[in-house]
């Protein structure tokens, strides 16, 4: 423990000096070596023993992670590295690479300022490499590159020294192409990766060595030495002369920004408040004496301390006993109980923690992932976290023993707090609890944790695909009457243009903006000024516009109208699935002058039925989730790979060859991917490597809609026939 204690003292000293802090994330495609890399960095910093590094999986502290050999949650750790005689504090987050856990990457990118992108030298860039890189650039996180498993190139693929350098250059080129394609301005302003400048390192995380151009000049180690040592299997002397932690952390300190530099640039992107306000100026300068401004990026449960909220502190200083507010919640003061930092799975308490650091705080009981935490009564919240994937699969869970039901409800509430990419719903009529997640593995892990960590025995259904509903044409005006017939609401509906859907998904159009800012963006994208300035609500990718003129009592009724709208959009008329990509206009309203006759029981059902009937009139159709799939096989197995895609209602988008392997890229509906792993293995004699990524929703073919709708309605206990608009307009 003495080693840990000494480390905490060094960390505490550096915390208050932002120019000596680096907040970094380790990101990559699954199995490219992030966690092994993280462990060896920790070993170099003297936090775990050298013998255990790479096998201990210190960062994978969860039993499920160790058993599966993958990272599921993002893990935080703080350590100290010495560069040119000065100590630096490195706050590092190791993130998952499996596509099902992409939400953890999204959240980690908000907390950090720089990212080490890890790419396997043999496999090269993969779909998840692209996704994590896009997320980093969106959050203004500066990347550096580590090409891992270089020893495999030499010992498995038997390439010569020249070929090795050509292959490594290809990987750098591919990553640069991705950066340029995603944001040319950043690429031209110094974000281009360049081995000569030292923003790229090569090595083997498993064997604990790495080289970079600056380090080779300093140490006299050449590519020839690297090649020869790998051929001879003498990795130990490489690890001695070019230790991984020294090369990589030198690169991190030299090329990734400190919180001062990063926040000057990042705050403009992740916070839309007034930059001249007290909190605005304080965040731009990472001022420890300013108001507290923290963004929660993770919630975990400690059996002794309860909920632990981890997040980036952009301004102010956290101390025990401080009263903080969670913006957007009931505005009750939450008293900080403990302030700490993470050393892998262990949370270590500190006296105080200033701006520019990643904090672990207990006592913030109202916080959820994405919360803005401050000591101000009012503050513009941080930009919401946007995930590139959406839930595509659902399982129903029930408690094995009825006595465990209250415990299950509490556990599901905790699980939803810990992982905001999950959607938990309770069907009041059937009493079933539904968990929707990013894929089969995601749901398997979550249900496994409920049993193992939370001690609740549960029974789960087979996974079901998540569908969405949308309109395909214009409809309206449709009249919705209140039950007492004294209030009438008229709505028009049409599909929302894809350009606007993308702007909402990317956070460029939201209700957090000023109405002028939002109006200008929409007008620039082809909207009428009148519509653009009268938006009353944006929920998921649906926009609600008030186009009425001079209706008495409308303002005081608007909250109820929005409640009716949200109820209609949460479960559409066709199959009670969420509605998306709709533009809904309120064009006229007739309200009773007496408030008692236009209460919730009158307004909410009237609006709900008008919207649901309108969606049916507007050609309601189902959307199904699609996944992009990449299959890499030997050349002679190409036919088997393509037939696996085409036989599942899929289409082949691209076929590329490299050496004696071929990569087939296609799109396949998630509904057709059940059992895929077994089928592709047997079809290709176990010689296929594949991965998937979320590719949005597409309309279900007409010939299948009726069968799918009836099956969903049957499962949900609804009438087993196709609904009609008249059903909602009694």
Curated annotation (Swiss-Prot):
Transport among keywords: no
Keyword GTP-binding in record: yes
Molecular functions per Gene Ontology: GTP binding; GTPase activity; translation elongation factor activity
Protein keywords: Cytoplasm, Elongation factor, GTP-binding, Nucleotide-binding, Protein biosynthesis
Disulfide partners: none
Binding positions (GTP): 28-35, 94-98, 148-151
Modified residues (Diphthamide): 597
Cited SUPFAM superfamilies: EF-G C-terminal domain-like, P-loop containing nucleoside triphosphate hydrolases, Ribosomal protein S5 domain 2-like, Translation proteins
Highest taxon above the source species: Archaea
Domain tr-type G residue range list: 19-260
Predominant location category: cytoplasm
Protein localization: Cytoplasm
UniProt xrefs under SMART domains: EFG_C (SM00838), EFG_IV (SM00889)
Annotated Gene Ontology cellular component terms: cytosol; ribonucleoprotein complex
PROSITE patterns linked: G_TR_1, G_TR_2
Family membership noted in the UniProt record: Belongs to the TRAFAC class translation factor GTPase superfamily. Classic translation factor GTPase family. EF-G/EF-2 subfamily.
Function: Catalyzes the GTP-dependent ribosomal translocation step during translation elongation. During this step, the ribosome changes from the pre-translocational (PRE) to the post-translocational (POST) state as the newly formed A-site-bound peptidyl-tRNA and P-site-bound deacylated tRNA move to the P and E sites, respectively. Catalyzes the coordinated movement of the two tRNA molecules, the mRNA and conformational changes in the ribosome.
PANTHER family: ELONGATION FACTOR-LIKE GTPASE 1, TRANSLATION ELONGATION FACTOR-RELATED
Protein name: Elongation factor 2
Lineage: Archaea, Methanobacteriati, Methanobacteriota, Stenosarchaea group, Methanomicrobia
């Amino acid at each position: 423990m003495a080693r840990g204690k000494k480390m905490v003292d060094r960390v505490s000293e550096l915390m208050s000096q932002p120019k000596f802090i680096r907040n970094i994330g380790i990101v990559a495609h699954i199995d490219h070596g992030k966690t092994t890399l993280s462990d060896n960095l920790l070993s170099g910093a003297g936090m775990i023993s050298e013998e255990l590094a790479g096998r201990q999986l210190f960062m994978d502290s969860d039993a499920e992670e160790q058993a599966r050999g993958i990272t599921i949650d993002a893990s935080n750790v703080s350590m100290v590295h010495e560069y040119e005689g000065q100590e630096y504090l490195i706050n590092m987050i190791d993130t998952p690479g499996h596509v099902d856990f992409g939400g953890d990457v999204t959240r980690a990118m908000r907390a950090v300022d720089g990212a080490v992108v890890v790419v396997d030298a043999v496999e090269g860039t993969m779909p998840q490499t692209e996704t994590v890189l896009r997320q980093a650039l969106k959050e203004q996180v500066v990347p550096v590159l580590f090409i891992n498993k270089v020893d495999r190139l030499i010992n498995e693929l038997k390439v010569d020294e020249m070929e090795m350098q050509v292959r490594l250059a290809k990987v750098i080129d591919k990553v640069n192409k991705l950066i340029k394609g995603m944001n040319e301005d950043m690429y031209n302003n110094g974000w281009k990766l360049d081995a000569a400048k030292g923003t790229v390192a090569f090595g083997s995380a498993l064997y604990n060595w790495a080289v970079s151009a600056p380090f080779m000049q300093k140490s006299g180690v050449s590519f020839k030495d690297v090649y020869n040592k790998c051929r001879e299997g003498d990795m130990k002397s490489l690890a001695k002369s070019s230790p991984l932690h020294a090369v990589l952390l030198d690169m991190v300190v030299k090329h990734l920004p400190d919180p001062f530099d990063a926040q000057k640039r990042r705050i403009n992107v992740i916070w839309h408040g007034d930059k001249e306000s007290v909190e605005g100026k304080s965040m731009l300068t990472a001022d420890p004496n300013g108001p507290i401004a923290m963004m929660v990026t993770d919630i975990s449960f400690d059996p002794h301390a309860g909920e632990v909220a981890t997040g980036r502190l952009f301004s102010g200083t956290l101390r025990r006993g401080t009263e903080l507010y969670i913006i957007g919640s009931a505005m009750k003061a939450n008293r900080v109980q403990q302030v700490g930092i993470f050393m892998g799975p262990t949370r270590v308490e500190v006296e105080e923690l200033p701006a520019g650091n990643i904090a672990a705080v207990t006592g913030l009981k109202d916080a959820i992932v994405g919360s803005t935490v401050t000591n101000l009564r009012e503050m513009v919240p941080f930009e919401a976290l946007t995930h590139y994937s959406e839930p595509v699969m659902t399982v129903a869970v029930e408690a094995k023993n009825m006595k465990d039901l209250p415990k299950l409800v509490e556990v599901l509430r905790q699980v939803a707090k810990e992982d905001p990419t999950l959607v938990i719903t309770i069907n009041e009529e059937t009493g079933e609890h539904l968990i929707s997640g990013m894929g089969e593995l995601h749901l398997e892990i979550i249900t496994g944790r409920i049993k193992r960590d939370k001690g609740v025995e549960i029974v789960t259904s087979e996974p079901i695909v998540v569908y969405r509903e949308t309109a395909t044409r214009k409809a309206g005006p449709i009249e919705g009457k209140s039950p007492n017939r004294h209030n009438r609401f008229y709505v028009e509906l049409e599909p929302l243009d894809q350009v606007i859907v993308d702007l909402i998904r990317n956070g460029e159009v939201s209700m957090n903006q000023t109405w002028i800012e939002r109006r200008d963006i929409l007008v620039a994208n082809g909207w009428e000024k009148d519509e653009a300035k009268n938006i009353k609500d944006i929920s998921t990718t649906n926009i609600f516009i008030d186009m009425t003129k001079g209706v008495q009592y409308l303002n005081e009724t608007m909250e109820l109208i929005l409640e009716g709208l949200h109820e209609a959009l949460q479960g559409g008329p066709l199959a009670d699935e969420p509605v998306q990509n709709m533009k809904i206009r309120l064009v006229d309203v007739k309200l009773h002058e007496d408030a008692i006759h236009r209460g919730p029981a009158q307004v909410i059902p009237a609006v709900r039925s008008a919207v649901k009937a309108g969606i049916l009139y507007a050609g309601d159709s189902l959307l199904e989730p699609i996944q992009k799939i990449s299959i890499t096989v030997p050349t002679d197995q190409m036919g088997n790979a393509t037939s696996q895609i085409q036989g599942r209602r899929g289409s082949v988008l691209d076929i590329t060859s490299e050496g004696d392997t071929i990569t087939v890229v296609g799109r396949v509906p998630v509904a057709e991917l059940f059992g895929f792993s077994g089928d592709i293995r047997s079809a290709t004699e176990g010689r296929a490597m594949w991965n998937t990524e979320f590719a949005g929703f597409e309309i279900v073919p007409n010939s299948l809609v009726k069968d799918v709708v009836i099956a969903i309605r049957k499962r949900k206990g609804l009438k087993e026939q196709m609904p009609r608009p008249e059903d909602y307009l009694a």
